[in-house]
């Protein structure tokens, strides 16, 4: 099986002494947008040699976010450039920016067929007809387009399956299988991706398409435990510069999010069933979610709420003087457990006094 691995999305959570990028560094170009984002007041596109290189979000809208923090996203074309890491590190060093963690990374494998010639459409059809059973996350969607084809005097409707995904926008990680050739043809063509396919020996024609299995990992999914060793594994910038580490990360998440077994009768323990081999048997880690960083932990949500509302709960007591400290602890706890967005949504409601 021939496939090409790549990073298709990379966003870094960073900090600097000033909390802003220095737009007087003349090696790069800077374009300030007329609007910011939901979480940051300013959005700046950084250009390199006249092409969009980075998108920088700066100046937090809320005190919940870390002061002087920035989010730096690498523009898609540069992710496929061999000199991407050199250019990115040069920018970070010149602006004295420190990377704290990865906000999001998408790692993809592009191929024509799975291991042993299994066609992606065959996999999708077998799953939808219950011939195959998915192991793991139950939320998912199938994607298709339908068309009519004339047969004699009549026309017949057909379905063309274009994708299958597991997970949701709220998930720490999700997997998405889709027809990348079809997307480039119908949404936006990207010649640099087609060049990657050509260099990798993939076929991209009208009859033979390139498919992509995309693993999208958010900040709360960057840390996990390897069941076999008991050790914690943390996805960071350094690991993403190593092609072997990238492959390990991809196959680890692909195994935990996009695995199938034959759906036979009498299955009592799915973990003992042989899995359908999709790739070439590359090394992977036996991923286990760390409880301490689980965004769905009810106890953590209750504790964050109690800390945030401390001044209202204990009004009239000396403890109210420590309201700022309590909120700071709540913010740090939310950040450590992947609940920052949840806290941002709740804080306005919590800041409304419940008693007069």
Question: Language-model segments: what does each one mean?
Answer:
Residues 295-303, 307-309, 313:
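Helix-turn-helix DNA-binding segment
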């Amino acid at each position: 099986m021939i496939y090409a691995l790549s990073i298709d999305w990379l966003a870094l959570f960073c900090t600097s002494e000033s909390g802003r990028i220095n737009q007087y560094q003349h090696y790069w170009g800077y374009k300030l947008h007329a609007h910011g984002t939901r979480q940051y007041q300013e959005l700046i596109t950084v250009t390199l040699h006249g092409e969009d290189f980075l998108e920088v979000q700066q100046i937090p809208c809320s005190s919940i976010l870390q002061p002087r923090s920035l989010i730096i996203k690498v523009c898609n074309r540069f992710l496929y450039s061999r000199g991407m890491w050199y250019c990115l590190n040069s920018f970070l060093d010149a602006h004295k920016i420190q990377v704290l963690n990865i906000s999001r990374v998408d790692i993809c494998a592009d191929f024509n067929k799975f291991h042993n010639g299994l066609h992606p459409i065959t996999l999708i059809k077998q799953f939808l007809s219950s011939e195959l059973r998915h192991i793991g996350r139950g939320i998912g969607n199938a994607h298709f387009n339908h068309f009519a084809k004339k047969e004699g005097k009549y026309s017949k409707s057909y379905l063309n399956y274009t994708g299958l995904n597991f997970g949701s926008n709220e998930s720490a990680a999700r997997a998405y299988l889709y027809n990348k050739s079809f997307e480039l043809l119908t949404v936006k063509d990207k010649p640099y991706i087609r060049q990657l396919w050509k260099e990798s020996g993939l076929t991209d024609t009208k009859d033979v398409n390139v498919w992509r299995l995309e693993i999208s990992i958010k900040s709360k999914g960057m840390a996990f435990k390897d069941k076999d060793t008991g050790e914690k594994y943390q996805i960071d910038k350094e690991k993403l510069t190593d092609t072997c580490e990238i492959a390990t990360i991809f196959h680890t998440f692909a195994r935990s999010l996009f695995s199938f077994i034959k759906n036979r009768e009498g299955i009592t323990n799915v973990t003992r069933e042989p899995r359908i081999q999709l790739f070439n048997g590359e090394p992977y880690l036996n991923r286990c979610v760390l409880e301490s960083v689980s965004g769905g932990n009810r106890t953590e949500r209750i504790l964050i709420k109690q800390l945030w509302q401390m001044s209202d709960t204990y009004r009239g007591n000396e403890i109210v003087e420590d309201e700022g400290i309590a909120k700071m602890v709540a913010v740090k706890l939310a950040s450590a457990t992947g609940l920052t967005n949840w806290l941002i949504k709740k804080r306005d409601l919590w800041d409304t006094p419940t008693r007069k």
